[in-house]
Swiss-Prot record:
Substrate binds at N74, H80, D87, L101, S102, R111. Gene3D superfamilies: Dehydroquinase, class II. Catalyzes a trans-dehydration via an enolate intermediate. It comes from the Bacteria. Its EC number is 4.2.1.10. This is 3-dehydroquinate dehydratase. One of its GO terms (biological process) is chorismate biosynthetic process. It catalyses: 3-dehydroquinate = 3-dehydroshikimate + H2O. The keyword Lyase applies. The record marks R18 as: Transition state stabilizer. One of its GO terms (molecular function) is 3-dehydroquinate dehydratase activity. The lineage of its organism: Bacteria, Bacillati, Bacillota, Clostridia, Eubacteriales.
Amino acid sequence: MNNILVINGPNLNLLGKREPDIYGNITLENINQKIKLHFKNEDLKIDFFQSNEEGKIIDKIIESEKKYNAIVINPAAYSHYSIAILDAMRSINIPVVEVHLSNIYKREEYRKKSVTAEASLGVISGFGYYGYIMAIEFILNNLVRER
């Protein structure tokens, strides 16, 4: 069985309430349910982790290598400046795909740069919750099933 960890960063626990014109009305719990439902017929276990604390995200990334085949991460605001999360992502030997619900390139200037993208295989941005599904599909079709 393949194991994938989905990590969500700060304020994503506020989805459904926070800036619905940008992020929509869907909650993080609804997103997690949609992901699980989409992959219900796969030989796949998906775990979800959300934290507003940088250190907890770093710890989760570092310990993930022991248990997971890959990570899908939405670092949220940390993507724009967290060298510590970037370094944690670089320190592990499993693939990481970065996801953003909104199109960061259509947002404020300071949101258009993702430092964490440097340690990601790729970045999926602007497709809402479906970006997570796209990331997991990529992982399954191009990385995990090839082994």
